[in-house]
Amino acid sequence: MKRDVRILLLGEAQVGKTSLIMALVGEEFPEEVPPRAEEITIPADVTPEKVPTHIVDYSESEQTEDELQEEIAKANVVCVVYDVTKEATIEKIRTKWIPMVNGGAEKGARIPIILVGNKSDLQMGSSMEVILPIMNQFSEIETCVECSAKNLKNISELFYYAQKAVLHPTAPLYDPEEKQLRPACSRALTRIFNLSDQDNNQILSDDELNYFQKSCFGNPLAPQALEDVKMVVWKNTTDGVQDNGLTLNGFLFLNTLFIQRGRHETTWTILRRFGYDDELELTDDYLYPQFRLPPGCSTELNHLGYQFLQRLFEKHDKDQDGALSPAELQNFFSVFPCMPWGPELYNTVCTTDKGLLSLHGFLCQWTLIAYLDVRHCLECLGYLGYPILSEQDSQTQALTVTREKRIDLEKGQTQRNVFLCKVLGARGAGKSAFLQAFLGRSLAAQRESPGEPSPYTINTVQVNGQEKYLILHEVSAETQFTKPSDAACDVACLIYDLSDPKSFSYCASIYKQHYMDSQIPCVFVASKTDLPEASQQPGLSPAEFCYKHCLPPPFLFSCHSQGPPGTAIYTKLATAATFPHLNAVELGAASFWLRVALGAAVTALVGFTLYRVLAKNK
């Protein structure tokens, strides 16, 4: 909505333009009228719409043609004033003033016009009969107001309608020639209907209508008022009411009726509540609310975000099979301008046996978006109507910003639930297969239905009895690490082909260049263990290299099996990411059991000492 309104008064000499302005300001008819009034600003707090309003007079005798064109260009709305007692001033509306204001403008860019019939105190009847053909000819005319500067009749109403024409314009909503909603308005209202239809049955029930009414206007409708609304729709449409609820056609008809009856501010209130601007586009303030992400922190969905998304999943799972089919997913995204997820989705998250998107996979995908691209996540939650449907100020309340990673390392603990693992290795080392194995897919299953490749996979892993999300990001062997942030992650997985004598040297080089002096835990993985092992190029063996650099020995891995691949390596990666402050070697099995044995020995020693003290006291 515009932050201020600029009203320009035009018309023939002596029609009373200046008198109208002075009558509004002085609240009395001026005895002496100057040729032209100075520009007047009405403060926001004294206007009905709480918007500052500038009123500009025009005098043909004092201003040039160029000055007039400048004022027209600055105006938000033009009031063309005529004398109800002089038909010549009415004729000039058609032949002079409207062509001057909007002659070269296209329909969508025309300035709204209010026709003002002044000096109604001098005429018994009305000029509306003569004015109506002009209003029908020019669609930019919002309304016509008959008034009297002398009697102060309809003066404030005149400027209210002028304000309204700017703040709640008809032109973007309604085509008066076709007598129907414009396509952009119809699309916006259809989206609003679909968001408000919380059980996805294509009907707004009384409860849904009242929730909608309260959300937009602050109060629910009284039961009788609700029945009256449905009765009006039922009488005027063939399919507007169904099962005692409002259909989409009924909802669109109701808004058309508001506009036709001059109550387009009602439709604008609805549109603006759902984030639309004057061009019927969702505003940046709505889609991208202010959100600060400090360096070293990450973003995760919180319980509010997950609850909201789970409700929407269940709403669109029409057959209640616990998965979204392609058609159901398309319906889910019908409130978006375009489909935000491509076919690579099915190689990014877990799917059902039939290849459909499960609830688990659905929530994993949203977790991935929230972590990798928080701006896009906010945008998507905005399209889904999160602030309105969750009764929150903005979609930022569906997200949590984690503590800075540096502090986690200092304190030796973290509250984070999502971790990023970069998977690095030479071409052909098995990185893509490793990512797909994380989704439970063996090499045979991957070959049967390859699908669209994805550089990411995400799944959940249990770490010390807690569920964590682990994101695997496959880094191409051709990737150039130009800055430290390119290698940044929570854990690095360096994968090499056990059967390729040159494969390990690539991983060793990457480790020494980018990870050796960092605090990022690293895990080496020897892939394709089902193939004969090849001797690596001269130098340290993989096991010796890991020992030298205080790393756990390479983990042996193969996804060439009949059943789903093993998950131990992914648990190991998630554990390393969760506890980066521990020495990586401590993640090895031998070290773990050594610590268990030491702990048991210490416990036994304390117990024995305590026994001796107690025995002595006896």
UniProtKB/Swiss-Prot annotation:
Residues 1-591 are cytoplasmic. SUPFAM superfamilies: EF-hand, P-loop containing nucleoside triphosphate hydrolases. Residues 2-168, 416-579 form the Miro domain. It is a single-pass type IV membrane protein. GO terms for biological process: cellular homeostasis; mitochondrial outer membrane permeabilization; mitochondrion organization; mitochondrion transport along microtubule. GTP 2 binds at G428, G430, K431, S432, A433, K528, D530, C559. Its EC number is 3.6.5.-. SMART domains: EFh, RAB, RAS, RHO. Coiled coil: none annotated. It is found in: Mitochondrion outer membrane. Gene3D superfamilies: EF-hand, P-loop containing nucleotide triphosphate hydrolases. The chain crosses the membrane at residues 592-614. Mg(2+) 2 binds at S432, E474. Residues 184-219, 304-339 form the EF-hand domain. Ca(2+) 1 binds at D197, D199, N201, E208. Ca(2+) 2 binds at D317, D319, D321, E328. Belongs to the mitochondrial Rho GTPase family. This is Mitochondrial Rho GTPase 2. It comes from Gallus gallus.
